[in-house]
Amino acid sequence: MQFRIEHDTMGEIKVNDSQYWGAQTQRSLENFKIGTEKMPKELIGAFAKLKRSLAVVNHKLGKLSLEKSQAIIKACDCILKGELCGEFPLAIWQTGSGTQTNMNLNEVIANKATEILGGNFREKKLIHPNDDVNMSQSSNDTFPTAMHIVSVLEITHRLLPSLENLLKTFKEKSQQFKEIVKIGRTHLQDATPLTLGQEFSGYASMLEHSKQQILESLEHLRELAIGGTAVGTGLNAHKELSEKVAEELSQFSGVKFVSAPNKFHALTSHDAIAYAHGAFKALAANLMKIANDIRWLASGPRCGLGELNIPENEPGSSIMPGKVNPTQCEAMTMVAVQVMGNDTAIGIAASQGNFELNVFKPVIIYNFLQSLRLLSDSMESFNIHCASGIEPNREKIDYYLHHSLMLVTALNPHVGYENAAKIAKNAHKKGISLKESALELKLLSAEDFDKFVVPEKMIGPKA
């Protein structure tokens, strides 16, 4: 391996000659050999979009030459095309402002841009990482800006489409199952009837609410910290920079961004991300409930509830032949647990904004993006391999419906609550039907029982 000598304000350091990064990236590699968690590639892409937009705006504001601006833009485009994916090796366990990752971008872009201009960055840098690529910026405003950019883009292009697909499936199932009357359950005990379609409409409504909560959180994430520089005052930045960068980013990405109205808030608080992740946690709670319901309703095949049949995707046991497990449900419930854990980490980290800067930024965005990725992937997997293939087991559904003691609830208006309870308890004690119990207790005639206890008429309010 060949090395070259790079330098920064702390002196010289050896860098692998095949890499584009410079001294500060190398120091971070050597000083923070912690864990395996690296800066997410999605965040690097958001950073490249930001640096690209800044190069455009700094030229328009007369601060950066056209030649340098175009070279930086082309270098950023190389990153966005995936041509430099091996140049961003830093751990998330670094400075809490993300300074080393900001400089990683600056160094790689500067050296690539120098090359684009026909220079040799090993001998002389035609583009400076701080003076040109980082012009009018601080890590303190670029990193939180990149956090918001990647959050908005990933929610828009990844999370919401997956959520929409699963929501569509449950809406379709709700219609498909609307005529199937089944017994309801509360407290894990038998309750009054409803339709399977009504049950699935509840799942669809949960996901619709989660979607709206996430969309609402997006409006806060659109606000960008750029232009605040070191502490929020905008020192060394043009007064029009923040607005113009938001406009340029919006145009380039096709997604709306705006300048944060208060940069002091934008640098020291990550309440927008904590709020958005709160919506992720609420979605995770809904997914946990849905997955648990489905795996319980599909339990069996002979000794469980067995009201639903789910797709058989793979063998379920290494010792029990023929066993098939609700694996998609299990995977999604584990994802939900991870998201809830991430929410705790993000909430604690977001509370640590001391004075003018929060210095827990890398761990916040790492956990945020992990949750987003897991939720997106698990919903897509669950939809394709489980939800879309759910079918009712009519025989089991009808059996439970007509053997439930809670059908006695329909008798409340006719014999009163206490007498209805006597009918149910007597039936349960003697192992007889509700009808037989009512006749034995002489509380109803057979004709009246058949008229009052009709499960199909118990699935909604009466006029």
Curated annotation (Swiss-Prot):
Coiled-coil spans are none
Q: Where are the transmembrane segments?
A: none
Q: Report the protein name in the record.
A: Fumarate hydratase class II
The subunit field of the Swiss-Prot or TrEMBL record says: Homotetramer.
Tell me the residue numbers annotated for binding substrate: 97-99, 128-131, 138-140, 186, 318, 323-325
Q: Which HAMAP family match?
A: FumaraseC
Q: Which PANTHER family match?
A: ASPARTATEAMMONIA/ARGININOSUCCINATE/ADENYLOSUCCINATE LYASE, FUMARATE HYDRATASE, MITOCHONDRIAL
Keyword annotations for this protein? Cytoplasm, Lyase, Tricarboxylic acid cycle
The pathway entry for this protein reads as: Carbohydrate metabolism; tricarboxylic acid cycle; (S)-malate from fumarate: step 1/1
Q: What class of enzyme is it?
A: lyase
> Chief subcellular site?
cytoplasm
Disulfide pairings = none
Alphabetically, the GO molecular function entries are: fumarate hydratase activity
Q: Which organism is it from?
A: Helicobacter pylori (strain ATCC 700392 / 26695)
Catalytic residues in the record: 187 (proton donor/acceptor), 317
Q: In the UniProt record, does the keyword Zinc-finger occur? A: no
Gene name per UniProt? fumC
